[in-house]
Curated annotation (Swiss-Prot):
It comes from Glaesserella parasuis serovar 5 (strain SH0165) (Haemophilus parasuis). It is an enzyme of class 3 (hydrolase). This is Protease HtpX. The keyword Zinc applies. Belongs to the peptidase M48B family. Zn(2+) binds at residues 139, 143, 218. One of its GO terms (cellular component) is plasma membrane.
Amino acid sequence: MMRIALFLATNFAVMIVLGIILSVTGIAGNSTGGILIMSVLFGFAGSLISLFMSKTMALKSVGAEIITEPRNNAERWLVETVKRQSQQAGIPMPDVAIYHSADVNAFATGATKSNSLVAVSTGLLNTMTEDEAEAVVAHEVAHIANGDMVTMTLLQGVLNTFVIFLSRMIATAVSSSRNDDGEETQSSGTYFLVSMVLEILFGVLATIIAMWFSRYREFRADAGSAQLVGKEKMIAALQRLQRVHDPEELPGSLNAMMINGKAKEFFMSHPPLEKRIEALRNL
């Protein structure tokens, strides 16, 4: 959840800034070709910046420390576990970090498999059994082995491109008119307003698609963990999470918007725990 939230937040912020620049300056012009080229460039810029900043941002956001020399048995176990599992998965050893938090959480991030990170909270190490923690770490290693951050970046880049392109094509059509001399003119104020509103609306639809893909990745990472440590350990870890907290709970802002019930699942980066457990049992 942490890596997805950071990725999408950064991507969205960059998209908004670049979108305003495009609208105010009119860089893309009115031609379909010009709008398409700028949509691709700016669409992928947001996701690529998010990708290459992901590791640094994740570390700073939770105050995590990369373990260079284990200071206790817990850190030693964590480093050895990540090393063993990364060898099993056939990927370079990721950086291993730990951060102080009561939350039972872990995440993996990084631009490439050779420049990746696995971070675990002290709350997870203190709450879960060794087998359960091992399964969670394997889940994060599987994310790296599957190249999930890169695939999410490519998907987000494509979605961004469509959001920018469609919003500006529609805005161009809505804001264009002909004067008394038959010359085509465009209202810059209308263009800016329409393009920004459409970008937000299309952005919501793009988020739903991105979250669907994120949930699919979680099922794959669960299966990857099962291959590394056995599905019973992963099931036990998910059952522990069920007892500890409700990972399906959404931020209050979404509840305030009356996004609840079945609709909530469209905006969740992770599938409901019961569905993940059922999928593991069916392996």
